[in-house]
Amino acid sequence: MKKLKINQNIFLAFLLLFSSIYTLKAQDSKVVLSESKLTVLGTSNVHDWEIEAKAMSGKSHPTIVGGVLKGIKSLDFAVEVEQLVSGRKGMDANTLKALKSKTYKNIHFKLVNVAKTTITSTNNYSLETQGDLTVSGVTKRINQIFLVKVQGSKTIFSGKTKIDMTQYNIKPPKALMGAIKTGAAVIVDFKVTYN
């Protein structure tokens, strides 16, 4: 009887271990393009402008236990520079030139650490993070606050980031022989779904 009880305990321990490993592996996820949006918002001496990312990719590895976000093991995200589209050919050409798109194909973010996780409501979290942002071959460590929603097998990351283009050796684009000048700072507004 004792031997049977010990065997049952070993079996239960093995089952719990196996199921927790399976749960963690099941959390690897990729960007769902159809459910994601990233817009770059900028200014000029004439009018405000915006550019939308039409191609994005990336992977995330959140740790979710019982539907609760316990941490983010890894997160990366990339935007294809040549798929940044404003709908204005001249502006798009100037943007690609400024970002040196022939040499640097992607803008890339990679999570370095999560400093603080706050539960804001059921299945919603605020993450204070640091990550490496690479634009036009220049990498800078940035602070980024993510609002994260856990929705079944999906994790949805949203937020805004202010970027000074000159810190990445980018000359703000000009148009009409310099008559239209864009501001050096842009806001990146994003909502990216991983599944």
Task: Identify what each model region corresponds to.
Residues 26-195:
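Low-complexity, acidic/polar, glycine-enriched regions of mature
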Residues 1-30:
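Bacterial Sec-dependent N-terminal signal peptides
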